[in-house]
Amino acid sequence: DPGRSRRKTPGCNGPIAVKDAQAAVTDAENLKAAMAAHGATRGFMSAASPGVVSLFFKNHHYPSHEAYLHAIGEAMRAEYETVAKAGFVLQIDCPDLAMGRHIQYRESSLADFRKGAALHIEVLNHATRNIPPEQLRMHLC
């Protein structure tokens, strides 16, 4: 998509921090209420991976992609843990690990793409370290 490079998109121009931890709690409470109203007993909530956030919000603050990715992962950890604490399965959407190959990294060698993907997975694993594996699933597209 050649037009994509000319779009003005939001980006990171300062330290990343959670501004409203209550928002994720409220979302989980709303989903629980909706499930109860319809007799559902199991549910999941989805959240973006740190890697995909880094693709859509350009870094203008951190000294490297790695530092930026780690800051995103730490901020997303709060949301991930809120979802798990509420009893839901957390579905992490990770297009950066699949679709990113032919879109964002099409000019990169396969080895470079794999190196980047390994970093994204490392950050994701760190961000989800307090969540039981049975409460996690990954969506690739």
Q: Can you describe what each PLM-predicted range is?
A:
Residues 1-141:
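Domain-level signal for soluble alpha/beta catalytic cores
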